[in-house]
């Protein structure tokens, strides 16, 4: 048993006895498990001394791993113990058996990925639709009907909207000029747009010929001629020549060059079909910020500008053209905020909850302002008290230190206090109220005179003038104001 137990010693044995058999369990690995593992290895015709080293444990793991699916419980337990021992030899801390198995699986996955990457690097680079056959020859695979159908469907539904360009770029990955012409020929309608595209291609082909003149003299044997603009466009070159240019050493990527020309023409077409300028994209008062960002970047994609200019438009116009609510939030974030931070901060702006919160904040500010104004007004209206005893300000008579004045503090007479003083004083109209005689000064003293306008003369009695006698008689008959004749007539 001593030989079997000598697999671990010292610190490694202590680490072995700290590892649990199951996650959260009480039982831990002991020395008896090493003895049992040695006996099981002998039963499976394996050398027990392999348990003493890291490499030996790795060999045992490789040997047992292939039999795990069909093996018994004893085999699985032996495999688990060897995996734990493998990490103990490497002095890697594991808490239980499951953690050791997870680490081993992760390690094996990384190793497999590295091997696949090495194998891929050794193989010849292959770009669809040009692939390498079994004999090692580069052959062409035509675009599938599904790819062409997807392209036609995009044109029919989107009608040269900005998202057509990335769709074309994805479908034409690695395509030859012949494949690109096939995609363009499948477009049935929009012939005006296709004519614009042809004009752009011809302009770019002429520019290519100007920048790449033909070298004088014959072409050396075994060497391909240099492609002209029409060769890149696929009108004067064969499929085999295109494949040779694309796979040669050094290669001439005629497919990628032609693809750039087409995308340049598509940008002009998208600009024509989407005349809205990026400057006109502004967020509505109640429009969600997410919808505004979608419209902004959709229009930005159609802009014919460099990436630096588009980045500047995104940093400046996206904030500048937002509504006031979002603009306040975005300016508070600062110029270095990411798009994710902007959309998170402006989420819910414009909705009923946001409006209610803004209104509550405004009302709270207005209320606090009114309270502060009231407090300040009360402070400004502080009365200045005056002492009736000495006549000085700043204290009242109760607290006056001067000798008490004798008599009434108002009239100066003795025998009564100021509250009982009958000295005449002005009423609220500013008139003196006479004491003990007559009516108060705020009552009318005389009988009011009538203030009605004189009776109008309508001209009915212009020819009749009363005689002086009648006037005198009328005056005599009029009773005095204090008489009762107006009520009882001629009653004696």
Curated annotation (Swiss-Prot):
Region entry Disordered, spans: 103-124, 432-492
Positions of the record's site feature: Cleavage: 128-129, 359-360, 372-373, 427-428, 443-444
Sequence segments annotated as region (Interaction with membrane phosphatidylinositol 4,5-bisphosphate): 73-77
Region (Interaction with membrane phosphatidylinositol 4,5-bisphosphate and RNA), start-end ranges: 14-33
Annotated segments matching region Interaction with host PPIA/CYPA and NUP153: 185-223
Lipidated positions per record (N-myristoyl glycine): 2
Motif (Nuclear localization signal): 26-32
Note: HIV-1 lineages are divided in three main groups, M (for Major), O (for Outlier), and N (for New, or Non-M, Non-O). The vast majority of strains found worldwide belong to the group M. Group O seems to be endemic to and largely confined to Cameroon and neighboring countries in West Central Africa, where these viruses represent a small minority of HIV-1 strains. The group N is represented by a limited number of isolates from Cameroonian persons. The group M is further subdivided in 9 clades or subtypes (A to D, F to H, J and K).
Region entry Dimerization/Multimerization of capsid protein p24, spans: 273-359
Motif Nuclear export signal, chain ranges: 16-22
Species of provenance: Human immunodeficiency virus type 1 group M subtype F2 (isolate MP255)
Name this polypeptide is given: Gag polyprotein
Gene: gag
Modified residues (Phosphoserine): 144
């Amino acid at each position: 048993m001593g030989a079997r137990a000598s697999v671990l010693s010292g610190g490694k044995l202590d680490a072995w006895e700290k590892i649990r058999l199951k996650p959260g369990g009480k039982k831990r690995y002991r020395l008896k498990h090493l003895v049992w593992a040695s006996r099981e290895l002998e039963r499976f015709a394996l050398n027990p001394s392999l348990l003493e080293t890291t490499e030996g444990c790795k060999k045992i793991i490789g040997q047992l791993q292939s039999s795990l699916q069909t093996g018994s419980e004893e085999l699985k337990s032996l495999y688990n113990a060897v995996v734990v021992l493998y990490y103990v030899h490497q002095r890697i801390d594991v808490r239980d058996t499951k953690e050791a198995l997870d680490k081993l699986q992760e390690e094996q996955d990384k190793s497999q990925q590295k091997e696949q990457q090495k194998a891929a690097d050794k193989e010849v680079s292959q770009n669809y639709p040009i692939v390498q056959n079994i004999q090692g020859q580069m052959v062409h695979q035509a675009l599938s009907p599904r790819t062409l159908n997807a392209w036609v469907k995009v044109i029919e539904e989107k009608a040269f909207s900005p998202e057509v360009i990335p769709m074309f770029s994805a479908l034409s990955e690695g395509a030859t000029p012949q494949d690109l012409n096939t995609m363009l020929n499948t477009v049935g309608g929009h012939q005006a747009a296709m004519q614009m595209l042809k004009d752009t291609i011809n302009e770019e082909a002429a520019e290519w010929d100007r920048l790449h003149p033909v070298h004088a003299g014959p072409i050396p044997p075994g060497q391909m001629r240099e492609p002209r603009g029409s060769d890149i466009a696929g009108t004067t070159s064969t499929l085999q020549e295109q494949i040779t240019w694309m796979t040669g050493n050094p290669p001439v990527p005629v497919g990628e060059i032609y693809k750039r020309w087409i995308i340049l023409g598509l940008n002009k077409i998208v600009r024509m079909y989407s005349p809205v300028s990026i400057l006109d994209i502004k967020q509505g008062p109640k429009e969600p910020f997410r919808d505004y960002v979608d419209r902004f970047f959709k229009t930005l994609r159609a802009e014919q500008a460099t990436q630096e200019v588009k980045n500047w438009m995104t940093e400046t116009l996206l904030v500048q053209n937002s509504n006031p609510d979002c603009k306040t939030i975005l300016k508070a974030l600062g110029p270095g905020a990411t798009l994710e931070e902007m959309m998170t901060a402006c989420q819910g702006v414009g909705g009923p909850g946001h409006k209610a919160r803004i209104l509550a904040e405004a009302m709270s500010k207005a209320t606090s302002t009114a309270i502060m104004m009231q407090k300040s007004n009360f402070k400004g209206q502080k009365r200045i008290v005056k002492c009736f005893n000495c006549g000085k300000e700043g204290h009242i008579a109760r607290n006056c230190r001067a000798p008490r004045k004798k008599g009434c503090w108002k009239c100066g007479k003795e025998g009564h206090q100021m509250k009982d003083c009958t000295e005449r004083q002005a009423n609220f109209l500013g008139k003196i109220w006479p004491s003990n005689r007559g009516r108060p000064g705020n009552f009318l003293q005389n009988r009011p005179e009538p203030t009605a306008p004189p009776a109008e003369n309508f001209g009915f009695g212009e020819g009749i003038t009363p005689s002086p006698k009648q006037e005198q008689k009328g005056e005599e008959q009029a009773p005095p104001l204090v008489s009762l004749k107006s009520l009882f007539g001629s009653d004696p």
